[in-house]
Amino acid sequence: MKETKNTQPAILTTSLACLEALKSECDITPCATAGHSLGEYGALYTANVLSMEDAIKITGKRAELMNEAANETKGSMAAVIALSEEAINEGLKELQQEGKISVANYNCPGQTVITGEKHLIEKAVTLLKEKGAKRVIELAVSGAFHSELMKGAADKFAEYVKDFDFANGTIPVYENTDAKAVTDGNDLKERVSKQIYSPVHWTETIQNMVNDGVEVFIEIGCGKVLAGLNKKINAEIKTYNVYDIMSLEETIAALKENN
């Protein structure tokens, strides 16, 4: 299950089951949606851009192609804690003269994930600590996701999704690659391929959603990672969670209490 070809479909299926459980127990209508990396497919389903069947099929192919690219390129990723984006970019610029390394996720202030060739990630661990990072932790992942090493997978994926219907969203999807609100189905179809080799702008996504009037967030799926990130992005944000029966019941009770 550790390989991305297995984890991606499993995580999405779990997330969609949690979403359907919430919808069956609570009469809520979302005003917007977003998802972090793989989670964007849950967002596309929520916005009625993709059917459940197509979302799962597409995710399975995405996972397969990313797994192939990961096996071919042997990349890695690392989390950088408590170092400015400016200092990170400065360090990466030095290493980019030797090969492919870049930012994968702008998760929240003080937490950035980098991605690229394994030997460069290993060098970055030392270099970014020297530049003042509190910690730089190489992640237990099977590849350099959201990097140029995934470009081949993205090109094949773009061909694959051509055969699927991406409807116009009934609500905006705040998309990973530039944090903009998108409803056009054709635009979203193009963006899902680009997302495979581009950074996830989560900090900007949440900031934009709050600026556009979103007041309450519900994190659907495995765990409470995004709730923690959201709190660091904006301390006023309220994020509920649905990932098991207990969290479902707690979220329903809280939503009813707060109307």
Tell where the protein language model's regions lie, with residue ranges.
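Cys-dependent protein tyrosine phosphatase-like superfamily
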Residues: 167-171, 175-176, 181, 189, ...
